[in-house]
């Protein structure tokens, strides 16, 4: 079973992540940031991963450290759950609409953490979540997981835009991590 647990504790945050890549989309998320809980629940549901996240951060300052460290911890857990990456598809993509918004996410489980993020949000916050942290979450997750992630979001409602992106990320990662019995290591180099 492809699963992992990561615990990260700093002076700013205390985070535990448990993930099973071959799950059913069940989740228990408690980050202290209501909108982020909703997004990570959508990510798990559409990515068919079982996910538990318990996070405490210095939210009295702002949401930066908490969102960043959740991205780092989730990325580490995802990387650990994949293990040596033998027999995975490697590439995945998804186009997800949500009313007027459209999110396009493409991923490569390459071992090279990198992100490209294109979106223009209209509001600085959605509830208690800073929209600018969406880009930072993707970058932190990508670098920590060793996954290249390209994101492009269009739309008018920031909530719809961010939610479509989290759903698309879940779908794209599910596709890329899918097992393919015909594959060994999906690289001409022989390593990822």
Curated annotation (Swiss-Prot):
Its EC number is 4.2.1.19. InterPro entries: IGPD_sf (IPR038494), ImidazoleglycerolP_deHydtase (IPR000807), ImidazoleglycerP_deHydtase_CS (IPR020565), Ribosomal_Su5_D2-typ_SF (IPR020568). It is found in: Cytoplasm. GO terms for molecular function: imidazoleglycerol-phosphate dehydratase activity. One of its GO terms (cellular component) is cytoplasm. PANTHER family: IMIDAZOLEGLYCEROL-PHOSPHATE DEHYDRATASE, IMIDAZOLEGLYCEROL-PHOSPHATE DEHYDRATASE HIS7. This is Imidazoleglycerol-phosphate dehydratase. The lineage of its organism: Archaea, Methanobacteriati, Methanobacteriota, Stenosarchaea group, Methanomicrobia. The gene is hisB.
């Amino acid at each position: 079973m492809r699963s992992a647990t990561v615990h990260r504790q700093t002076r700013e945050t205390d985070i535990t992540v448990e993930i099973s890549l071959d799950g059913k989309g069940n989740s228990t998320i408690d980050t202290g940031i209501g909108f982020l809980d909703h997004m990570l629940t959508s990510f798990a549901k559409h990515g068919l991963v079982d996910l538990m996240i318990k996070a405490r951060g210095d939210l009295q300052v702002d949401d930066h450290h908490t969102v960043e460290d959740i991205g780092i911890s989730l990325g580490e857990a995802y990387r650990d759950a994949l293990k040596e990456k033998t027999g995975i598809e490697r590439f995945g993509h998804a186009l997800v609409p949500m009313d007027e918004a459209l999110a396009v996410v493409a991923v490569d489980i390459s071992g090279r953490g990198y992100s490209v993020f294109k979106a223009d949000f209209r509001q600085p916050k959605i509830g208690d979540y800073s929209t600018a942290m969406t880009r930072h979450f993707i970058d932190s997750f990508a670098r920590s997981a060793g996954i290249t992630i390209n994101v492009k979001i269009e739309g008018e409602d920031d909530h719809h835009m961010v939610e479509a992106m989290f759903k698309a990320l879940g779908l794209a990662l599910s596709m890329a991590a899918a097992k393919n019995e015909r594959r060994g290591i999906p690289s001409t180099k022989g390593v990822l």
